[in-house]
Amino acid sequence: MDMAFVEVCLRMLLVFVLSWTIFHVNNRKKKKATKLADLATEERKEGGPDVIIVGAGVGGSALAYALAKDGRRVHVIERDMREPVRMMGEFMQPGGRLMLSKLGLQDCLEEIDAQKSTGIRLFKDGKETVACFPVDTNFPYEPSGRFFHNGRFVQRLRQKASSLPNVRLEEGTVRSLIEEKGVVKGVTYKNSSGEETTSFAPLTVVCDGCHSNLRRSLNDNNAEVTAYEIGYISRNCRLEQPDKLHLIMAKPSFAMLYQVSSTDVRCNFELLSKNLPSVSNGEMTSFVRNSIAPQVPLKLRKTFLKGLDEGSHIKITQAKRIPATLSRKKGVIVLGDAFNMRHPVIASGMMVLLSDILILSRLLKPLGNLGDENKVSEVMKSFYALRKPMSATVNTLGNSFWQVLIASTDEAKEAMRQGCFDYLSSGGFRTSGLMALIGGMNPRPLSLFYHLFVISLSSIGQLLSPFPTPLRVWHSLRLLDLSLKMLVPHLKAEGIGQMLSPTNAAAYRKSYMAATVV
């Protein structure tokens, strides 16, 4: 009986302790939430920011400038304010330059020794062709791109953004987002002094690149690593045609050379395997000399090897694919490589990003209160639809072009690869049309489908000649299947209606590519 009494007492004590603990924890959470809300209100009263931007790369800096020009108070938090040393983001397509000018940032390409680009010089099996960006009366800007050192461009953008009095650019590492009832209210970050602090704003924009630590908590779009880009700089040299991106259809994938300054040439190539040769013990250098360099045309080989001979630092970067999805949470927007990525072979990431910033800044401009979650949600739905002509065209083209460039012993795949080279070599409407798509001068998914369809038919024609045999017919059917496998996933991911609507493409061109702002 005594034992039973003791057991009852122990159970009552346990229930009391658990109840008190739960009450105490909930009370602390409520107090913390109240404290955060009070801090946010106090910060707003003291002239706190309207928008917090995580990351001051190309996207964060450009967005800060655009929003600040519209009168918003912007707090930008960047992990490292030193000049970045990157291998990606070194080529701005003509369409990207147009977007940059629409944002009032075209002068950021000046004073960084940027080099003019007029097109692509393509090499395959000892043959070469040149494909130039077309002079298009419907494209209201100079039909040329720019090569440059990414870090110099980013620093110019940061300077431009911080020149506005309502932009606060701060070095710090964002640790986490501050949430209240599923709504993001601000961020917790460690400043340059090592102190952990907070910043609150009605709207937070995550724009911290492909290695974003915050993306996983906001979106379901996991990054897929498709390949590895390896590159280095050859210094004190100049290409024979510095205004061309030199693209070599090598094995297992492609190699590139382009002039990033008046004296520097970027050399890079792609590997598909995860088991990469080691850079530290010299395996990578030997691999480049023995396997990649012999495939580079003789006229380019000396420049390609110069960087290796002089011990240039070899960088390795992952090529990733991330489908675009809207954030599950309110009070926050994800942009840039944290939001959407495609294979970098057509160098279009910055172009899509600047297009996104132009669309988003115009949609947000009429909103008096960025804390109105419902209105911001409606803006984001509109943004997601309006960006499709540019983003869907570029995503599909980038990923498809990359798949075509991969070398293969499969006859159907090799026929498609040869067909692409022949198509760009043919001149006329074929070359100009495809180059307009690559350059972001004509963001129309329907036009892209047309060109991919014609490339497929031309490749099938080559496979069947001089006369069809059962084996050639079989390879032709497989080639057609390969073409569909490249396109169908993008149709599903981007939305069939959005991809096939000529009205959406026309509206995008009128609103965001017209000679005068509509």
Swiss-Prot record:
The chain crosses the membrane at residues 3-23, 48-68, 448-468. Pathway: Terpene metabolism; lanosterol biosynthesis; lanosterol from farnesyl diphosphate: step 2/3. One of its GO terms (molecular function) is flavin adenine dinucleotide binding. Its EC number is 1.14.14.17. Its cofactor is FAD. One of its GO terms (cellular component) is membrane. The keyword Flavoprotein applies. It is a multi-pass membrane protein. It catalyses: squalene + reduced [NADPH--hemoprotein reductase] + O2 = (S)-2,3-epoxysqualene + oxidized [NADPH--hemoprotein reductase] + H2O + H(+). It is found in: Membrane. GO terms for biological process: sterol biosynthetic process. Its main location: membrane. FAD binds at V58, G59, E78, R79, R86, F91, R158, V174, D337, M350. Keywords: FAD, Flavoprotein, Membrane, Oxidoreductase, Transmembrane, Transmembrane helix. InterPro entries: FAD-dep_OxRdtase, FAD/NAD-bd_sf, Squalene_epoxidase, Squalene_monox. PANTHER family: SQUALENE EPOXIDASE 5-RELATED, SQUALENE MONOOXYGENASE. Catalyzes the stereospecific oxidation of squalene to (S)-2,3-epoxysqualene, and is considered to be a rate-limiting enzyme in steroid biosynthesis. Belongs to the squalene monooxygenase family. This is Squalene monooxygenase 1,2. It comes from Brassica napus (Rape).
